[in-house]
Amino acid sequence: MVNKQLKKKAQEIGNVPTHYELEIEDYDQKQKKYGQAYFIWKDPKDPEKHITVELRNDGALLTFSTTVHSETDKKLPDAELKLTALQFAAANHPGTFMNFHFQGKEERGQHIRFVYTKMELGLPIPNSGFLIDMTRSGQIVHFLYYGEGHKAEVPTEFVAKEKVVSHYLNTMSFELMYDVIDGEQEPRLVYEPILPGYSYPADVDEIVPDQHIADERIENTAPLPPLQNKEEVDIFALLGFTSDMQKVSERDFGEQIGSTWRRGAAPERKDLSIGSYFETRNKNTIKMKTDKRTGKLKAALSFMDWRNNLQCSTEECQEIALQFLYALYPRAAEFFRVNPVRIDERGRVRNHFSVWYKGVPLRFGAARIIVNPETGLIDAFMAPDIEPEQLEAINHRPDVSAEEAKEAFLAAFDVKLEWQPDFTAGSDQHCKLVYKPVYPSYIDAHIRKKKRL
């Protein structure tokens, strides 16, 4: 289809009101077979109302979503909602939708999601089929089409399940961790199983990866070094914040407030492409999140275009990151350990500081600070999920022994067959059958309960 036809079809699928304005119109047709067209319309009177449509270059619908909801209290039964979902899929993919099987439904707040996938051996093929989100009144608010998915090659001979279970149990270990469970406010002390990061191939002819079991949160960490320069620093100055920057937007994220600050005027949009859209929104801005209760900085991302012509060494960038960390966390030496630095594809120095207390790490807790050596400023910062001082209130000595934790874990451990994409060389668009470990993600170190938590 030519661009005008794609745009017209997108308007029809999205049922776009005439007063809506086109915000993004982007065509990616570098690859004839997989080219795409992407459109977003918005209500000029209410920017929270927008309609998104993504089409393949032959006009097939890939994605549809809308935040425009019809005002009605009508509630339809699940069977009628499911029929509406199938009719929508059939209208947009008449030649393929019958190849997919109903996988299940999910309650998602005010919406209900129906998921259809392609099946082989009674198991779903990854990245296949489609999903549809609907309101209880029958309005479709989101559609995502994956298609036929990868080619699934059924093994001629299967590895015995008992051999797979034995392999995992002989290679696993346990580590004590602090962890925040199921969105709780306070972390717990738990045992975390450390297993190989791969799923075991089900085909006897497949080679099992020879992978060293490592946990970068634990291995190669070192005590936080003291600051060389102990002068007081301004964290906002280290981010490149200047007095002439103006707040251009603010957003409520629940426990945090997000804000965007810009230096100078926003650049004119060159066109309606996605690239131009983000350039206009981001150029010469610093975006931050702060805690509502404490006002403490939780995240920052800089899009400032500085031309300082510096060339800081990796060691100097590490010192800048340490200054920033100590300014935010004066007791940082008690709660953080330093991981090896990494240099990203843009030459920036990525500093990773894991959270530890009394010799025990926080499972998913780290401060991440990216320093730009060309400016000597911080391009990005992400705080740990919790305040490190919260760990002081936890008894860091387990009541449950490692052997008891292992016993509870073994009682719940199993493996199941599953199709997974095959990323090995020469396996493009294929997937393979594997045994995937199924196990409790943690064993509470203070509660003796032999059950999956």
Curated annotation (Swiss-Prot):
InterPro entries: YcdB/YcdC_rep_domain
Superkingdom assignment: Bacteria
Entry similarity comment: To B.subtilis YcdB.
Protein name: Uncharacterized protein YcdC
